[in-house]
Amino acid sequence: MFAVAATLVIVAGGASACSGGEAGSAPTIAPQETKVTVAGDSIALGLGTAMRDDAEGGPSDGAPLVVRAIGEDGTGLARPDNFDWPGRLEELAADFPPEVLVFSVGSNDAQDLTDETGATVATMADHEAWDEEYRARLARSFDAFADTGTRVVWLGHIRPEDDEVGETNRHIHELATEVAADRDDVIVEDLAVLTGSGADSTSECLSSDGLHLSRDCYSEAAEKLLAGIG
């Protein structure tokens, strides 16, 4: 579990208003909000939406926690010519660094790795080169927040119906765990653990498309992540 200096209380954006009191009483100062950003692909976007919804229904006293989700369908770290997540995270860190960043990709990355021009830099057939390049992209994503005080939470994906996608996203979770091991500001979480589905079978947690999570499993994972943040 991970912690930030705040009590878990959720508001739908903005700080809590100061409460009124009897004349002459000391004013109540609204606690400073804690900003959480969930970033990644459509799976991350679904989780971020569930976290935001769960947060809005949370308790009403203490430090407000505001959840923001930024996601791009069909993206990951494989194709910076399509969407450059490390670059986007560096922009976020420079402009609006949150207290907590939840980053989750992997299920769109069962493919060769390209550079920003679309040229292939590592094929899936060359396992060593692919792993080395993917580790570097994970490291750049994590290190974007090294000087901001942001707590980075890597979130691994569950295994979907497609075997190749499942083997790849579980392998990516292993790579992320390795990269995070020597970074004190990076926490590793796993949807397979948060939902209780396990790393090998996810039939009860998949939606009808065989890739995304069901609403109930998104909600379960969101609740546990928010509890960890609190």
Residue ranges and their predicted role:
Residues 14-17:
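C-terminal motif of bacterial Sec signal peptides marking the signal peptidase cleavage site
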Residues 29-129:
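Conserved SGNH/GDSL esterase-like catalytic core that processes O-acyl groups on lipids
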Residues 107-108, 141-171:
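Active-site segments of SGNH/GDSL-like serine hydrolases
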Residues 158-230:
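Catalytic His-Asp segment of secreted/periplasmic serine-dependent ester chemistry enzymes
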